[in-house]
Protein backbone atom coordinates (compact mmCIF):
# COMPACT_ATOMS: atom_id res chain seq x y z
CA UNK A 1 0.00 0.00 0.00
CA UNK A 2 1.11 3.54 -0.73
CA UNK A 3 3.86 2.43 -3.08
CA UNK A 4 4.17 2.89 -6.80
CA UNK A 5 3.55 0.16 -9.35
CA UNK A 6 7.28 -0.17 -9.99
CA UNK A 7 8.06 -0.39 -6.25
CA UNK A 8 5.33 -3.01 -5.77
CA UNK A 9 6.74 -5.17 -8.52
CA UNK A 10 10.29 -4.80 -7.13
CA UNK A 11 9.06 -5.85 -3.66
CA UNK A 12 7.26 -8.89 -4.98
CA UNK A 13 10.31 -9.90 -7.01
CA UNK A 14 12.62 -9.37 -4.06
CA UNK A 15 14.52 -6.57 -5.79
CA UNK A 16 13.43 -3.57 -3.74
CA UNK A 17 16.34 -1.30 -2.81
CA UNK A 18 18.77 -3.59 -4.59
CA UNK A 19 20.70 -1.80 -7.32
CA UNK A 20 23.10 -3.55 -9.68
CA UNK A 21 26.74 -2.57 -9.47
CA UNK A 22 27.80 -0.38 -12.37
CA UNK A 23 31.42 -0.60 -13.44
CA UNK A 24 32.73 2.42 -15.33
CA UNK A 25 35.68 1.61 -17.51
CA UNK A 26 38.31 4.35 -17.67
CA UNK A 27 38.75 5.96 -21.07
CA UNK A 28 41.61 4.41 -22.92
CA UNK A 29 44.21 6.79 -24.20
CA UNK A 30 44.30 6.89 -27.99
CA UNK A 31 47.64 5.65 -29.20
CA UNK A 32 49.21 7.52 -32.13
CA UNK A 33 48.90 5.66 -35.42
CA UNK A 34 51.96 3.88 -36.69
CA UNK A 35 52.34 4.38 -40.44
CA UNK A 36 53.38 1.27 -42.33
CA UNK A 37 55.11 2.30 -45.53
CA UNK A 38 55.82 -0.22 -48.30
CA UNK A 39 59.39 -1.00 -49.29
CA UNK A 40 60.95 1.62 -51.53
CA UNK A 41 62.32 0.81 -54.97
CA UNK A 42 65.72 2.16 -55.93
CA UNK A 43 64.16 3.18 -59.25
CA UNK A 44 61.59 5.90 -59.90
CA UNK A 45 61.10 5.10 -63.59
CA UNK A 46 57.56 3.71 -63.27
CA UNK A 47 56.15 6.56 -61.19
CA UNK A 48 57.88 9.16 -63.35
CA UNK A 49 56.40 7.62 -66.49
CA UNK A 50 52.98 7.40 -64.84
CA UNK A 51 52.91 11.00 -63.57
CA UNK A 52 54.31 12.37 -66.82
CA UNK A 53 51.60 10.42 -68.64
CA UNK A 54 49.03 12.13 -66.42
CA UNK A 55 50.33 15.48 -67.63
CA UNK A 56 52.42 16.39 -64.59
CA UNK A 57 55.44 18.57 -65.34
CA UNK A 58 58.76 16.74 -65.09
CA UNK A 59 60.32 19.42 -62.86
CA UNK A 60 57.48 19.03 -60.37
CA UNK A 61 57.80 15.24 -60.46
CA UNK A 62 61.53 15.46 -59.73
CA UNK A 63 60.93 17.99 -56.94
CA UNK A 64 58.51 15.60 -55.24
CA UNK A 65 60.93 12.68 -55.59
CA UNK A 66 63.83 14.71 -54.18
CA UNK A 67 61.72 15.86 -51.21
CA UNK A 68 60.49 12.34 -50.48
CA UNK A 69 56.90 13.39 -51.18
CA UNK A 70 56.54 10.53 -53.65
CA UNK A 71 58.35 7.25 -54.17
CA UNK A 72 58.03 3.99 -56.09
CA UNK A 73 57.13 0.98 -53.97
CA UNK A 74 58.08 -2.67 -54.08
CA UNK A 75 57.10 -5.20 -55.23
CA UNK A 76 54.28 -3.68 -57.32
CA UNK A 77 55.92 -0.38 -58.35
CA UNK A 78 52.97 1.68 -57.12
CA UNK A 79 53.07 5.45 -56.74
CA UNK A 80 53.18 6.35 -53.04
CA UNK A 81 52.39 9.95 -51.98
CA UNK A 82 53.54 10.89 -48.48
CA UNK A 83 52.44 13.51 -45.95
CA UNK A 84 54.76 14.67 -43.15
CA UNK A 85 54.34 16.27 -39.72
CA UNK A 86 56.23 19.28 -38.33
CA UNK A 87 59.22 17.08 -37.47
CA UNK A 88 59.40 15.83 -41.06
CA UNK A 89 58.20 12.39 -39.98
CA UNK A 90 55.96 10.52 -42.46
CA UNK A 91 52.44 10.33 -41.00
CA UNK A 92 50.27 9.70 -44.04
CA UNK A 93 50.68 7.83 -47.33
CA UNK A 94 48.44 6.86 -50.21
CA UNK A 95 49.21 4.42 -52.99
CA UNK A 96 47.94 3.87 -56.50
CA UNK A 97 48.89 1.51 -59.30
CA UNK A 98 51.03 2.83 -62.15
CA UNK A 99 49.48 0.42 -64.65
CA UNK A 100 45.95 0.21 -66.04
CA UNK A 101 44.53 -1.41 -62.90
CA UNK A 102 42.47 0.77 -60.56
CA UNK A 103 44.29 -0.11 -57.36
CA UNK A 104 44.48 2.69 -54.82
CA UNK A 105 44.06 3.45 -51.13
CA UNK A 106 45.73 4.66 -47.95
CA UNK A 107 48.65 2.83 -46.35
CA UNK A 108 47.93 1.21 -42.99
CA UNK A 109 48.28 3.65 -40.09
CA UNK A 110 47.78 6.76 -42.23
CA UNK A 111 46.72 9.87 -40.31
CA UNK A 112 44.74 12.23 -42.55
CA UNK A 113 45.65 15.19 -40.33
CA UNK A 114 48.95 15.09 -42.24
CA UNK A 115 47.88 14.48 -45.83
CA UNK A 116 49.97 15.09 -48.95
CA UNK A 117 50.82 18.76 -49.51
CA UNK A 118 53.26 21.15 -51.13
CA UNK A 119 53.64 24.18 -48.90
CA UNK A 120 57.00 25.91 -49.07
CA UNK A 121 55.52 29.40 -48.71
CA UNK A 122 53.97 31.60 -46.02
CA UNK A 123 50.98 32.39 -48.22
CA UNK A 124 47.76 33.43 -46.48
CA UNK A 125 45.85 31.44 -49.13
CA UNK A 126 45.42 27.67 -49.05
CA UNK A 127 44.33 25.64 -52.10
CA UNK A 128 42.40 22.42 -51.43
CA UNK A 129 42.22 19.34 -53.69
CA UNK A 130 40.56 15.95 -53.42
CA UNK A 131 43.75 13.99 -54.12
CA UNK A 132 47.47 14.30 -54.75
CA UNK A 133 47.15 13.96 -58.55
CA UNK A 134 44.72 16.91 -58.68
CA UNK A 135 47.17 18.93 -56.60
CA UNK A 136 50.10 18.12 -58.89
CA UNK A 137 48.00 18.91 -61.97
CA UNK A 138 47.22 22.35 -60.57
CA UNK A 139 50.90 22.97 -59.79
CA UNK A 140 51.66 22.09 -63.42
CA UNK A 141 49.05 24.57 -64.67
CA UNK A 142 50.58 27.30 -62.50
CA UNK A 143 54.02 26.54 -63.95
CA UNK A 144 52.63 26.70 -67.50
CA UNK A 145 51.22 30.14 -66.67
CA UNK A 146 54.70 31.27 -65.64
CA UNK A 147 53.91 31.33 -61.91
CA UNK A 148 56.13 29.95 -59.18
CA UNK A 149 54.09 26.93 -58.07
CA UNK A 150 56.28 26.54 -54.96
CA UNK A 151 54.86 29.80 -53.62
CA UNK A 152 51.39 28.25 -53.43
CA UNK A 153 50.05 26.48 -50.34
CA UNK A 154 48.65 23.28 -51.89
CA UNK A 155 46.88 20.68 -49.73
CA UNK A 156 45.17 17.38 -50.57
CA UNK A 157 42.11 16.32 -48.55
CA UNK A 158 43.17 12.69 -49.07
CA UNK A 159 39.85 11.71 -50.60
CA UNK A 160 36.36 13.01 -51.25
CA UNK A 161 35.00 15.04 -48.33
CA UNK A 162 31.57 13.82 -47.19
CA UNK A 163 29.50 16.46 -45.36
CA UNK A 164 26.54 15.78 -43.07
CA UNK A 165 23.06 15.50 -44.54
CA UNK A 166 22.27 18.78 -42.81
CA UNK A 167 25.08 20.89 -44.25
CA UNK A 168 25.21 23.28 -41.29
CA UNK A 169 26.21 20.37 -39.03
CA UNK A 170 29.18 19.39 -41.19
CA UNK A 171 32.65 19.32 -39.69
CA UNK A 172 35.80 20.78 -41.21
CA UNK A 173 37.95 18.02 -42.80
CA UNK A 174 40.69 17.00 -40.36
CA UNK A 175 43.47 17.98 -42.78
CA UNK A 176 42.14 21.51 -43.15
CA UNK A 177 41.15 21.79 -39.49
CA UNK A 178 44.69 21.05 -38.33
CA UNK A 179 46.15 23.49 -40.87
CA UNK A 180 43.83 26.33 -39.80
CA UNK A 181 44.59 25.65 -36.15
CA UNK A 182 48.35 25.73 -36.70
CA UNK A 183 48.49 28.63 -39.19
CA UNK A 184 46.53 31.67 -38.03
CA UNK A 185 47.74 33.72 -41.03
CA UNK A 186 45.41 31.90 -43.46
CA UNK A 187 42.62 34.18 -44.64
CA UNK A 188 41.57 32.69 -47.97
CA UNK A 189 40.59 29.12 -48.92
CA UNK A 190 40.31 28.14 -52.59
CA UNK A 191 38.35 24.95 -53.26
CA UNK A 192 39.41 22.96 -56.33
CA UNK A 193 36.94 20.11 -55.82
CA UNK A 194 35.48 18.16 -58.73
CA UNK A 195 32.44 19.24 -60.73
CA UNK A 196 30.57 16.01 -59.96
CA UNK A 197 27.73 15.69 -57.44
CA UNK A 198 30.02 14.75 -54.55
CA UNK A 199 32.40 17.61 -55.31
CA UNK A 200 29.62 20.19 -55.56
CA UNK A 201 28.03 19.01 -52.32
CA UNK A 202 31.38 19.15 -50.52
CA UNK A 203 32.05 22.63 -51.89
CA UNK A 204 28.68 23.93 -50.71
CA UNK A 205 29.23 22.48 -47.25
CA UNK A 206 32.70 24.00 -46.86
CA UNK A 207 31.46 27.38 -48.06
CA UNK A 208 28.64 27.20 -45.51
CA UNK A 209 30.75 26.31 -42.47
CA UNK A 210 33.86 28.39 -43.28
CA UNK A 211 32.58 31.63 -44.82
CA UNK A 212 32.06 33.36 -41.47
CA UNK A 213 35.82 33.36 -40.80
CA UNK A 214 37.46 33.00 -44.21
CA UNK A 215 37.09 34.07 -47.81
CA UNK A 216 36.08 30.84 -49.53
CA UNK A 217 36.48 30.64 -53.32
CA UNK A 218 35.04 27.93 -55.58
CA UNK A 219 37.46 27.14 -58.42
CA UNK A 220 36.75 23.61 -59.75
CA UNK A 221 38.95 21.94 -62.39
CA UNK A 222 38.11 23.04 -65.93
CA UNK A 223 38.13 19.51 -67.37
Task: List the model feature ranges, each with a label.
Residues 53, 59-80:
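Active-site-proximal, Lys/Arg-enriched surface segment
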Residues 1-50:
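Non-catalytic accessory segments of DNA primases and related replication-initiation nucleases
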Residues 122-126, 188-189:
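Short active-site oxyanion
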Residues 51, 81, 88, 130, ...:
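Terminal peptide-recognition signature
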Residues 128-133, 158-162:
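Conserved mixed alpha/beta catalytic, RNA-binding, or beta-rich assembly cores of soluble enzyme
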Residues 1, 135-144:
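Short active-site loop/helix that positions an aromatic residue
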Residues 102-124:
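Glycine-/acidic-rich phosphate or pyrophosphate-binding loops and their flanking alpha/beta elements
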Residues 142-223:
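TOPRIM fold recognition
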Amino acid sequence: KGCSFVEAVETLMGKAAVMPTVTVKPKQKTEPKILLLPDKSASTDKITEYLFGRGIDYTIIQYCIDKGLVFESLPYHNLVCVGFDEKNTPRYASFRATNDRRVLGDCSGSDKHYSFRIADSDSSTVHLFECAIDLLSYATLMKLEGKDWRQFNLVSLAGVYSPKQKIEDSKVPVTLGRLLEKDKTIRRIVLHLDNDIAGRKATKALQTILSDKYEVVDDPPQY
